[in-house]
């Protein structure tokens, strides 16, 4: 990737949580997702996190549902950028998820027209796919700056600090607090 000027970066981060507070609420309000969680989500986390094997399905839902866009929702999107050597930060937190996503798309459309790159830690494999899926679930058209089904990995206009820190390796530790 060619050198990117810092005044052409939009630093982006999302915060997520489960769509419902408890698995009982999920069962009451969305039986299809409840059955899907019991069939797939529950077993996925038991397989990948053996230390949580003894947790109930409800405990697993509470702990992990926010990590999957099918079972979670976005509660905050924060964006930072540099204008005239001054750092600016904007967070979208008011209203529900749909309002947050609409404001995010408006911002992304504006920076796309200005030739910006997106920047974040694990942005390519978490934030952008999560945003895209939640936008589709909420019937909101994603911004053209976001990757779509036919975008090749090298075509994504995003600088991922996790990738930068790993220097091409997938084995090292690269948690954001370790990088900082």
Task: Name the predicted role of every residue range.
Residues 1-110:
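Conserved RNase H-like, two-metal-ion catalytic cores of nucleic-acid enzymes
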